Amino acid sequence: NLDIHTHLGAGAYICGEESALLNSLEGGRGEPRMKPPFPAVEGLYAKPTVINNVETLCVVPYIVNEGAEKYAALGTEKSKGTKLVSVSGHVKKPGNYEVVLGTPTREIIYDLAGGIRDGNKLKAFIPGGSSTPMLPADKVDVGYDYEAIAEAGSMLGSGALIVIDDSVNIVETTLRLISFYMHESCGKCTPCREGTRWLYQIVERIMQNKGQLEYIDKLEDICGNMAMKTFCPLADACVSPVVSSIKHFRSDYEEYFKKIPVSSV
């Protein structure tokens, strides 16, 4: 027997980070802690604390009732079991789907989610939520599991599969993602607090046809000074769409520079 208490959070994205979540539960400001000590050693109210996502807890009854071997028989050799995939974006049937790990991403997009809407074609997809690198359409046959997605250059993340069709300019998509992380930054770490704003301002100028070609290099330089330099991965999350969009869709950026009058450069 055990007691379950639920607490309604204020909706801050940063509180998805485990130590920021602990601060919030204690009534403090939602911002990450220095680690170590890790929560399993010193967590909620300085007590050892185990933190799990709801999806992890949901598979426990199946494993207890059916056995670990039956659960491990699902999926790939290294990625066992199933994954809840939240498909959004330019698909005919957005929604939540449970798939066996290793299912081809193409099958999720075209069979389960009904394919690309409005007769358009797939341009890109973000496999595991906005914090994971976007991939071009030619990677759509990759298996939806941790190892295969990593080999393709991204991460499975939260399983939030975002589908982008060919009506979209990737620079605009990138700006929207940067805007989200700029808003959700708790401001504790300088690289994140300042870096997200710099990225937003530069990409915005590019979209306003006020940028210069070297702005692309400047974006990559700023990203290099943000990644792995903060208390939590929010800065890395903001860097992800910028770096991956430049890598796979540099031409979308360069298209804006063709519109700039020579006298304005």
Predicted regions and their residues:
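Hydrophobic alpha-helical positions that pack around
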Residues: 1-101, 113
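Terminal amphipathic helices with adjacent charged low-complexity linkers/tails
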Residues: 4, 117-151, 247
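Active-site loop ensemble at the mouth of alpha/beta enzyme cores that anchors a bound cofactor
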Residues: 24-36, 138-155
